[in-house]
């Protein structure tokens, strides 16, 4: 089984079935503070099948095995993961770094066993990388 953020699936074959689950009231709280989607879709292949995921902004998709080492991800970078991967909200210990460091106060910690697929450039990072190249209209 693969779980992914709502809207991340691009296409799938007939043998793959989708289940949508919400995190309940606790999930709504986590979604509100972490910036991740309230709904996760689970995909299960009843027979051999294929599924493809896509991103909503420019960048790359990076596969990471979190079995040996947990990973802290910025909001909106989690695309999909194996069902064995746990996702939890992570609070920055240094409040100043969260507010002024561009990392955000709340992130997502991903622990294994299993693999996750991450979007490498959240829209905020894209905007920050393009800002110096934009000429101000004076």
Identify the function of each model-found stretch.
Residues 1-138:
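Composition-driven recognition of glycine/serine/threonine/acidic- and proline-rich low-complexity segments
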């Amino acid at each position: 089984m693969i779980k992914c953020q709502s809207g991340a699936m691009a296409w799938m074959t007939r043998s793959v079935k989708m289940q949508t689950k919400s995190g309940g009231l606790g999930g709504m709280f986590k979604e509100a503070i972490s910036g991740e989607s309230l709904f996760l879709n689970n995909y299960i292949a009843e027979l051999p099948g294929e599924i493809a995921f896509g991103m909503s902004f420019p960048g790359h998709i990076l596969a990471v095995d979190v079995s040996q080492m947990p990973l802290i991800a910025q909001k909106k970078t989690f695309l999909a993961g194996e069902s064995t991967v746990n996702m939890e909200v992570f609070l920055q210990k240094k409040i100043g770094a969260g507010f002024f460091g561009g990392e955000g106060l709340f992130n997502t910690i991903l622990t294994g066993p299993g693999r996750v697929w991450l979007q490498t450039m959240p829209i905020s990072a894209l905007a920050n990388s393009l800002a110096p190249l934009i000429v101000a209209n004076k």
